[in-house]
Amino acid sequence: NIEVGHTPASIRESLLEKVLKMGDKFVAAVKKEYAPGIIGPFSLQSVITKDLELIVYDVSLRVPGNPIVATTSPYTKYQYGQTFGVGRRIAMEIKRAQEEDRLDEIVT
């Protein structure tokens, strides 16, 4: 299979916990192998089989997407009460880390 385009999508709610656990496992594995671990946005580029098995085929260690695809997540509104792009979220997280004197945890 080859990637032939980008289409934003949301995941079935019944699969959301599985997807989030995959992300958590990736973060933990990277932290174990390459301290301090991954800092910043990433995407586990995946496919879902007809049997609803999730298969990661690539990791994008940057803000995922392309200029044509919106750079926001449908879940941002649930967490923050509003919709905005990844850049604003990163800025908010940096500001919060500064206010909490935790910049050393998010900057290398």
Where are these regions (language model features)?
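ATP-dependent carboxylate/phosphate-activation module, predominantly the ATP-grasp catalytic core
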Residues: 1-29, 60-91
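Generic detector of bulky aromatic hydrophobic side chains
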Residues: 4, 8, 43-46, 95
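Acidic-enriched, low-complexity/disordered segments with a strong bias for Aspartate over Glutamate
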Residues: 24, 51, 58, 101-104
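Structural motif corresponding to the C-terminal cap of alpha-helices
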Residues: 30-31, 98
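Conserved metal-phosphate-binding beta-hairpin within the catalytic cores
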Residues: 32-68
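Residue-identity detector for glutamine
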Residues: 45, 79-82, 98, 102
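Cysteine/selenocysteine-centered motifs that mediate thiol-based redox chemistry or coordinate metal-sulfur cofactors
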Residues: 89-108
